[in-house]
């Protein structure tokens, strides 16, 4: 009887122990053009998603083209928060390249605010030693206060509103919550097929590396005539390996991101 009690007690301790939580090790690059050599462990939740932002630290994150995270990006009450004001800002990346994946997060933005979520991005240096913007190589899922930011009325058919593929495909239905409220985003990338979801509704889909993709680029601000470098990079989005970085945009406005997680697909 005593032996049975001991066995049950040990089993219960093991079942409830936080140490039993699943972990996933990802390799990240710590600097521009650096190899993904630094190993970092992240929690894997019950849905099989890797929580690439733990709500407490910025491990795995750095500024685009830098070896550090700019000080205007902070951890604030469980959120990754970009603050307006003085000091260095700029776009940021999670420094591991993903190929086939589901990316989920929630965001909210200030009144009249603008930001974006990038995927399959590359760090592209200019010959003069500066950096091209991340959106020269990465599709952008728009983050916007649709009611108060002028970009919502620009572009074509609402293709600059929240969760749109920026300047190419409008998110329909347009179901974004107002500024100051949380919106949920889900981006699915698998073998070139891409979906944007907003607040649990699929709002657009498209396929990379197809004649239709090239046509969309040619009809956008990223056309071969208007911006040859962007056209070349986006037309071969993800490079030869069809993989790239996840990033968030500093557009000068306060924005918060939380519950950032990724599921790697085969």
Describe the function of each predicted region.
Residues 17-18:
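Short, low-complexity, intrinsically disordered N-terminal modules
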Residues 21-266:
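Carbohydrate-interacting regions of secretory-pathway proteins
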């Amino acid at each position: 009887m005593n032996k049975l009690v001991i066995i049950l007690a040990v089993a219960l301790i093991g079942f409830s122990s936080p140490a039993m939580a699943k972990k996933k090790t990802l390799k990240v690059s710590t600097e521009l053009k650096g190899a993904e050599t630094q190993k970092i462990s992240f929690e894997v939740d019950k849905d099989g998603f890797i929580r690439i932002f733990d709500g407490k630290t910025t491990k795995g994150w750095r500024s685009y083209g830098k070896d550090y995270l700019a000080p205007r990006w902070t951890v604030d009450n469980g959120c990754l928060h970009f603050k307006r004001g003085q000091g260095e800002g700029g776009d940021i990346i999670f420094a591991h390249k993903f190929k086939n994946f589901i990316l989920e997060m929630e965001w909210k933005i200030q009144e009249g605010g603008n930001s974006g979520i990038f995927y399959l991005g590359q760090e592209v240096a200019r010959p003069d030693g500066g950096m091209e913007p991340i959106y020269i190589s990465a599709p952008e899922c728009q983050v916007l206060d649709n009611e108060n930011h002028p970009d919502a009325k620009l572009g074509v058919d609402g293709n600059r509103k929240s969760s749109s593929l920026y300047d190419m495909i409008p998110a329909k239905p347009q179901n974004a919550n107002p500024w100051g409220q949380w919106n949920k985003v889900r981006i699915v990338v698998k073998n070139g097929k891409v979906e944007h979801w907003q607040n649990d509704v699929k709002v657009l889909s498209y396929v990379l590396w197809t004649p239709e993709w090239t046509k969309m680029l040619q009809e956008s601000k990223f056309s071969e005539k208007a911006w040859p470098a962007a056209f070349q990079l986006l037309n071969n989005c993800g490079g030869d390996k069809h993989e790239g970085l996840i990033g968030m945009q500093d557009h000068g406005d306060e924005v918060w991101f939380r519950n950032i997680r990724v599921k790697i697909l085969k």
